[in-house]
Amino acid sequence: MKHKKPFIVKTAGGAASQCLGLMAAIRVSKLIDRPFVIRHFPYSTGGYYPLAIGPFLSPEEILESAAPTRGLIPADDLAVGRVIENHPMLRKGFTYEKFLKLIRRLKLETIGKRMRGEWYLNYSISRLNKVSRSIKSISGGYFPFVDENVNKEMHSRFIHANIDSPFATHEDEKGQINVVIHYRIGDKRTTYSHPGIMGDGIVDPNSFKRILQAEGLDKNFKVQVISDEPDVAQALLREVGIEAEKNSEVGDLWKDLYLMSKGNIIICPWSTVSQFALTFLVSSGRKVYYPTATSEGWGGKWQLPGVTNYLATYLPKTHSLYHPN
């Protein structure tokens, strides 16, 4: 009976990152036959990302929705997704958060966490499949994987939350090819002003254009752009000759994901939103393009069969999007 005690799932980052953590939690829960509870760290990535997957959880599955970050006293008026300017990772000198980054760089994090009963997945499908029944907790990096049983439960949780499920099956429009481009802008604007905190560069729209050209699409197709900044994304695509319809409702990730699920061809940037989308797009047989690496050359440790990788180019450091002022 002692192994029926819930194990803790540590999450951080935005809604899509949290969804990847939830999928890992479901997979591990089924594997070791124990329930899970979520402990969310809204400040640990250097930006503010509150718990967003609450609608998909039961009250007993939430252990802590705002776990603290050592050395940080958060302000009351933090904006979601914005850099926390007084975050320990941005301070001069050696801080606890910088110590953790050093441990990761030296590849000692797995050993340290294992000693305290925490199973560090580290973007590894083999580690996801080898979790001990006696673990106290699991932590990321979380990554996309395809498990039909997990997908079915995610679909059920979306339906229970009264949110359109991207895991639902769709019938394609006859004679119509629907291309969806996910164009992440948002926090990528701070790639160079806050290096090491808010991700990597913004994809050059020519990368998307090359894919459309390689597909050899005739006139009977439409392009829809899904973005956290749809006006900017639409303008960037127009600069290279791509006319795209934009999502009408800004800031609703769940609707964006649902729209992505209805595409025939989906072109993604390097983004956790796109990574989460891969879990339902690949399983439904959609053609999905995903970059081989970030602007910094990091290619990740996970591979997902059914994804077509492409070599993305990125907007240069001098581009105005990185310098809004």
Question: What do these predicted ranges mean?
Answer:
Residues 15, 212-305:
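Donor-binding and catalytic core of enzymes assembling or modifying cell-surface/extracellular glycoconjugates
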Residues 295-325:
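Contiguous terminal or domain-adjacent regions
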Residues 50-219, 313-325:
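Secretory-pathway luminal glycosyltransferase catalytic domains
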Residues 38-40, 180-184, 223-227:
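Short beta-strand segments
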Residues 34-45:
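A short beta-strand-loop structural module common to alpha/beta enzyme folds
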Residues 1-13:
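Nucleotide-activated donor-dependent transferases that construct or modify glycoconjugates
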Residues 21-28:
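Short amphipathic alpha-helix
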Residues 10-20, 190-192, 198:
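A short, glycine/small-residue-rich beta-strand->loop->alpha-helix junction that serves as a flexible
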